[in-house]
């Protein structure tokens, strides 16, 4: 099989390495020439996955047309804000029948579309049925190291979900299939916002009780938004919902949790992301998820609080107090 991965960041490179490790011929494309040169010459990506050796069947190209030539599988692994321009550039070189796997997590701010909705907005209609989402508790570094991981692959066509599942399945990477694309997308996007809240809680020393409350109530508001968008609530109890949320809220590998800890220390989100050197999607997603919730009439108090901390200068401790002092109500 020939596969193309658009985006050579940590997640794109980890998935490209996984596919190449199965013996597929894989080409990585990116805007960053230095990263592509490192992959092509040294079989490494020291910027995003330092110290890891990449398979020799993983190649690199700076030209979209060349990278997509003959591709039987396309993986879209760019940051959420880059999805639309990259798909616009790539669409002439993708053909009907080729599965397109979106692993970007976000809601486009201008349109409030999920990532698959953005892709469908750009691609010709005959390509829409071949679109799939891969999401779940999966840090790139651990996948690249071959540590056991389970994810969800969602597509409207069961055949496409199964095809993508088979393409990615290895002895250390286990995909489950689903038909709930929107549930997987909302779960994968909004958990990043809750993870910022988790980082703030940890950074301020609020303890295990607070963390358990955040994860539980965070899942509740993620589920409300997803269901309003048409998702199956059970999806949010699975890998793409609860699984991804628990991982992102609890691990030091989480960039969004790191942002929260930095905010608790008095740093700005911009300064924290500069230190990280990578995108923390929750910073953007706090704005877009809040706007989508307002449009759909969904109450999302944790998301609202994080938005106010990031964009209105609300002190993290005041945000916590505001959450705790909201009007009391039944849990369910």
Swiss-Prot record:
Pathway, per record: Membrane lipid metabolism; glycerophospholipid metabolism
EC number of this enzyme: 1.1.1.94
Compartments reported by the entry: Cytoplasm
Catalytic site positions: 191 (proton acceptor)
One GO CC term on file: cytosol
Any one GO molecular function term: NAD binding
Enzyme class name: oxidoreductase
Alphabetical UniProt keywords: Cytoplasm, Lipid biosynthesis, Lipid metabolism, NAD, NADP, Nucleotide-binding, Oxidoreductase, Phospholipid biosynthesis, Phospholipid metabolism
InterPro entries: 6-PGluconate_DH-like_C_sf, 6PGD_dom2, G3P_DH_NAD-dep, G3P_DH_NAD-dep_C, G3P_DH_NAD-dep_N, NAD(P)-bd_dom_sf
Binding site for sn-glycerol 3-phosphate: 105, 136, 138, 191, 244, 254-256
Reaction it catalyzes: sn-glycerol 3-phosphate + NAD(+) = dihydroxyacetone phosphate + NADH + H(+); sn-glycerol 3-phosphate + NADP(+) = dihydroxyacetone phosphate + NADPH + H(+)
Pfam families, alphabetized: NAD_Gly3P_dh_C, NAD_Gly3P_dh_N
GO biological process terms, semicolon-separated: carbohydrate metabolic process; glycerol-3-phosphate biosynthetic process; glycerol-3-phosphate catabolic process; glycerophospholipid metabolic process; phospholipid biosynthetic process
Binding site for NADPH: 10-11, 31, 105, 140, 255, 279, 281
Cross-referenced HAMAP family: NAD_Glyc3P_dehydrog
Family recorded in the similarity comment: Belongs to the NAD-dependent glycerol-3-phosphate dehydrogenase family.
Function: Catalyzes the reduction of the glycolytic intermediate dihydroxyacetone phosphate (DHAP) to sn-glycerol 3-phosphate (G3P), the key precursor for phospholipid synthesis.
Matching NCBIfam families: PRK00094.1-2, PRK00094.1-4
Protein name in UniProt: Glycerol-3-phosphate dehydrogenase [NAD(P)+]
């Amino acid at each position: 099989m020939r596969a193309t991965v658009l985006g050579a960041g940590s997640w794109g490179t980890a998935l490209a390495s996984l596919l190449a490790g199965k013996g597929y011929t894989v080409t990585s494309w990116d805007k960053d020439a230095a990263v592509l040169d490192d992959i092509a010459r040294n079989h490494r990506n020291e910027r995003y996955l330092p110290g890891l050796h990449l398979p020799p069947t993983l190649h690199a190209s700076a030209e979209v047309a060349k990278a997509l030539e003959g591709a039987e599988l396309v993986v879209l692994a760019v940051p959420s804000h880059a999805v639309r321009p990259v798909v616009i550039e790539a669409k002439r070189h993708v053909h009907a029948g080729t599965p397109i796997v979106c692993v970007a997590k976000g809601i486009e701010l201008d349109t409030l579309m999920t990532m698959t909705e953005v892709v469908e907005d750009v691609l010709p209609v005959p390509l829409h049925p071949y679109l799939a989402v891969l999401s779940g508790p999966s840090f790139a570094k651990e996948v690249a190291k071959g540590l056991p991981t389970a994810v969800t692959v969602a597509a409207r066509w069961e055949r496409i979900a199964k095809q993508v599942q088979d393409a990615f399945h290895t002895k250390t990477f286990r995909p489950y299939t689903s038909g709930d694309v929107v549930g997987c997308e909302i779960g994968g996007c909004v958990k990043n916002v809750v993870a910022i809240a988790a980082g703030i809680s940890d950074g301020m020393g609020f303890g295990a009780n607070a963390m358990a409350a955040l994860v539980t109530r965070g899942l509740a508001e993620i589920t409300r938004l997803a269901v309003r968008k048409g998702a199956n609530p059970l999806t949010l109890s699975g890998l793409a919902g609860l699984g991804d949320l628990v991982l992102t809220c609890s691990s030091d590998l989480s960039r969004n949790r790191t942002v929260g800890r930095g905010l608790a220390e008095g740093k700005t989100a911009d300064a924290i992301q500069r230190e990280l050197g990578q995108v923390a999607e929750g910073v953007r997603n706090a704005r877009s998820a809040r706007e989508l919730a307002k449009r759909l009439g969904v109450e999302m108090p944790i998301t609202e609080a994080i938005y106010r901390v990031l964009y209105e200068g609300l002190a993290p401790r005041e945000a916590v107090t505001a959450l705790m002092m909201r009007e009391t109500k039944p849990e369910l």
